[in-house]
Design a protein with these regions (language model features):
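Generic extreme N-terminus detector
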Residues: 5, 13-14, 26
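C-terminal motif of bacterial Sec signal peptides marking the signal peptidase cleavage site
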Residues: 27-31
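Short, aromatic- and cysteine-enriched interfacial helices/patches
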Residues: 17, 34-36
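Bacterial N-terminal signal peptides that target proteins for export
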Residues: 10-20
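A residue-level marker of the well-folded mature domains of exported/periplasmic proteins
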Residues: 36-400
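Short, Lys/Arg-enriched N-terminal segments with co-localized hydrophobic residues
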Residues: 1-9
Length: 400
């Protein structure tokens, strides 16, 4: 078992260096401070005072310990947890920390508050100075633990709670590369039916915002295409993800995108000789003949800056919401079998996103229920994007 783990660890190391080639890693931390373009991103949690405060003293690099709570096992080699762990390894590499300074808790069910609390407490007992809880469902328990242990720093990924002191939230503008991947899908569909396997329904703004950004990207190049969404109601459920992808394929969808944690949608797309859009990590290795591109994370940009701030004593409790400008999110190189002209359309939109000309959720947007959101000449606020997108764009159909 030890040998098997080390083999998987070496594979992750190789993948880490591959990802280094995709991103500029902000090794000097220039341009990727911990707050990363927060704008009006919501801070208040209901737990304690929300006024941001700087940490009073740092922690020596030799003595710092970093805890990580993972939803699944990064040894799986693809998907959400794998990508976060690549980010942790990047942080470790950038800061020169030893393996003994990284404490991992894996396969922690984020719907089990007792299991979450136990994992966090174990990290505290093992001397961790900062703990990253990487899944949405860890949010409330992490907030509670932060109040109980004010001398430990807590950082929660993908949610919205924080206290402005020892507990912050981090995420990224993943809707930006989602939009670009929508362009890719819209350019390459032949049936004008595009499937999307979603972990959560419209109640979850993270997932729904990604779907809408993707649909807007599709619409920008192919207004005739329709997006069909099948929800699994779980962040990580291999069987449900496989079943959802199968349902969409049976509807004649010829591009399958996803916001879920396994590679099953990619694998099924390859088996059925249709296209796919990967998520979290580069999934072309899993479905080389299907994957048009992948929407990916470079979590090491944030993890490095956050841990460095604890070492330096400059942690201020602010939230992080970086985007393509901060290199925390991106899109992989397009497959060489993409339709001619796809790269040009992606490059044009990417340039506009980075310059700020294109905000994705711009102007008046029509929903699939006939209502509208947004205002002419304005872009949705960060707080709306992260917490209030509970609607679907007009070309989206929810599959029951």
């Amino acid at each position: 078992m030890i040998i098997e783990y080390e083999v998987m660890r070496m594979k992750r190391i190789k993948s880490f260096f591959k990802i280094l080639g995709m991103f500029v890693l902000c090794a000097s931390f220039t341009g990727c401070g911990v707050n990363g373009n927060v704008d009006d991103y919501a801070v208040n949690t209901g737990y304690g005072d929300s006024d941001t405060v700087k940490s009073s003293s740092g922690v020596s690099k030799d003595s710092i310990k970093v805890g990580v709570i993972h939803l699944s096992d990064p040894a799986d080699g693809s998907g959400y947890t794998y990508t976060h762990d690549i980010g942790i390894m990047g942080m470790q590499q950038n800061l020169g920390l030893s393996d003994s300074q990284i404490i991992r808790k894996i396969n922690v069910n984020d719907s089990d508050k007792d299991a979450t609390r136990k994992a966090i407490k174990e990290c505290i007992d093992e001397g961790c100075n900062i703990i990253f809880s990487t899944s949405w469902g860890y949010m409330e328990t992490t907030a509670q633990m932060a109040e109980e242990y004010p001398d430990v720093y807590f950082s929660h990924g993908t949610g919205y709670m924080s206290n402005g002191k020892n507990f912050n939230n981090y995420f990224g503008r993943i809707y930006q590369p989602r939009y670009l991947s929508g362009i890719v899908a819209g350019m390459n569909t032949k049936t004008n039916k595009i499937g999307y396997v979603a972990a959560m329904g419209s109640e979850n703004s993270e997932v729904t915002g990604g779907i809408d950004a993707f649909a807007l990207g599709v619409y920008s190049v192919n207004p005739s295409a329709q997006i069909y969404v099948k929800v699994t109601n779980s962040w990580y459920d291999p069987a449900a993800e496989k079943a959802a992808a199968s349902t969409l394929l049976n509807m004649n969808c010829d591009v399958i995108a996803q916001h879920c944690d396994t590679t099953y949608p990619q694998l099924l797309a390859q088996q059925k000789n249709v296209y796919s859009i990967g998520y979290n990590s580069d999934m072309s290795k899993d479905a080389p003949d299907a994957c048009l591109c992948s929407v990916i994370w470079n979590w090491s940009a944030y993890y490095t800056a956050a841990v460095q701030s604890v070492i330096d004593g400059t942690w201020d409790g602010s939230n992080y919401y970086g985007g393509m400008n901060e290199n925390i999110v991106g899109i992989t190189q397009l497959a060489d079998f993409c339709k001619s002209g796809t790269q040009q359309k992606v490059d044009e939109a990417k340039k506009d996103i980075i310059s700020g000309k294109l905000g994705i959720f711009d102007g008046v947007i029509e929903t699939n229920t006939g209502t509208t959101v947004g205002e002419s000449g304005k872009t949705l606020k960060d707080s709306d994007i992260t917490g209030n997108i509970n609607w679907y764009f007009k070309t989206v159909t929810l599959v029951q």
